[in-house]
Amino acid sequence: MKYTLEIQKLLYQINDNKSLTPKDKVKMYKQAADIADANDDIEWGYDVRVKLIQECFALASGTELLTEFTWLMNAYENHPDWFDENDFLWQYKWVLGELYNNPDVSMEQIRNVMEDFKSRLERNGFSLQPYYDRLFDENTLLGNFDEAKKYLDLRNNAPDDDMGNCPSCLLDNEIDYLLAIGKFDEACTRVQPLIDKLISCSHVPARTYCSIMYYADKLGRKEEAVRFFDYAEEAMKQIIEDNDESMCSSVGKMVCHLFGAGEEQKGWDYFETSLPWYFESNGQLQFEYTVAVWEGLLKLSTETINLELPTNFALYNKECVYRVDDLRNYFKSEAESLATAFDKRNNSDVFIKRLK
């Protein structure tokens, strides 16, 4: 069949061309999936999408992930004898994160999906560790620290298996919790396995270092802030080279640090790199980025700056000269809008308090 050769050709090109970005790969996988769909070939459509959602992990926006994952779920439900549910259970964890990141998704919808995820783990004989970890992360974000501690204990006591989150991600979440409850020194101690390079994954320790650096700046711990910036910058090199836009909020924290540390030009360089990523992101990534950049801009006395910014930026001008005060107002306004949406969804005031 000619169409299967077209699909195989695209898959070969994806595997053979090492210069392709995740976004390039997603686009080509979608082409292959469209060919399969046009020929009513569910099996090829399924196989291609399993690969496609793997690449979605490096995208800042979760729209593609949610769309293609929904297709996989429907294919499995309609043909349970054709496919293995374990093919996509790991990626289900990413989907949960994207639902929390989108303020348009109600908490009721999230709860229903969480229970579905839990039931699928149980019926496939897996530990509930990733389920508890998700609830731990959610409650930390919402400032429900007693609940967070409850789920942290459940997570840590749950058996580990092939569906469990990697040790570096588990540690990263725990460090976020320690920072949020004011245990900065303990967070700096717990991070040592990452510093010693005993564990790591695609975004950790870069993300972790940026979080500790950000809190160090807020606490006036300048020595620790500089030390963890240095760690973060080294860990970010490959991420920036790979144009991994899903890390935009972490780069935003680096911008904030540099503006406060008197390294303004370097901060603008990172700003120019990360702003296009911001426009590809959504939800919580955008919120974290806008807050960090706004906080950084508050530290500057500069009035105008020459920048090469994307043409889709609301303040873009051909002269490439920008008033810093306009940038401050823009990012504060964006942060306030996102905070309002999240707090309305979450029935809380946690996000807007970040801007006080």
Annotate the PLM regions:
Residues 31-61, 81-82:
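Short, charge-rich amphipathic alpha-helical segments embedded
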Residues 9-19, 49-61, 89-103, 129-144, ...:
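Tandem amphipathic alpha-helical repeat scaffolds
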Residues 223-313:
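Active-site/pore-lining binding-face segments in mid-to-C-terminal subdomains
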Residues 1-30, 43-45:
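N-terminal leader/linker segments that initiate helical-solenoid repeat arrays
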Residues 18-31, 60-74, 102-116, 139-154, ...:
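Helix-turn-helix repeat elements of alpha-solenoid scaffolds
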Residues 6, 25, 45, 65, ...:
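Residues that mark the junctions of alpha-helical repeat units in TPR/alpha-solenoid scaffolds
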